[in-house]
């Protein structure tokens, strides 16, 4: 199995649907005996540039270990889900479990533990 980092951006009007989407994707990974090493909900953030006249979006980060077939299935699900504005999948060499730099000093939600965490800005 290979390691991947996935970030997807959800339309701000669909922010309430993000937990259900994440659960669906977690199920797809678990059914293929994959592992989720890191799952973070970055919340609504300002986009660097407007996408379809939208200036803010809901961000989610996942670090997973699974087969390439499951990643293709996830990307197909992203493509056919109109709520997902953009997605990016990167193959990594090893599992990443520490908090991402995007969380620096801000309150964010780690979806694996289900608890809110306060990251310390350095």
Curated annotation (Swiss-Prot):
Disulfide bonds: none
SUPFAM superfamilies cross-referenced by the UniProt entry: Ribosomal protein S6 (SSF54995)
Highest rank taxon of the organism: Bacteria
Keywords: Ribonucleoprotein, Ribosomal protein, RNA-binding, rRNA-binding
One GO molecular-function entry: structural constituent of ribosome
Alphabetical GO biological process terms: translation
Cited function: Binds together with bS18 to 16S ribosomal RNA.
Protein name per the record: Small ribosomal subunit protein bS6
Organism: Neisseria meningitidis serogroup B (strain ATCC BAA-335 / MC58)
This protein's encoding gene: rpsF
């Amino acid at each position: 199995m290979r390691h991947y980092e996935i970030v997807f951006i959800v339309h701000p009007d669909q922010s309430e649907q993000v937990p259900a989407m994440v659960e669906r994707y977690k199920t797809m990974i678990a059914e293929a005996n994959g592992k989720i090493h890191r799952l973070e909900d970055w919340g609504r953030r300002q986009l660097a540039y407007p996408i379809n006249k939208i200036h803010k979006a809901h961000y989610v980060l996942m670090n997973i270990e699974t087969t390439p077939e499951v990643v293709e299935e996830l990307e197909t699900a992203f493509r056919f889900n109109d709520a997902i504005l953009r997605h990016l999948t990167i193959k990594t060499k090893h599992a990443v479990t520490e908090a991402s730099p995007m969380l620096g000093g801000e309150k964010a939600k780690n979806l694996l533990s289900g608890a809110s965490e306060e990251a310390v800005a350095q």
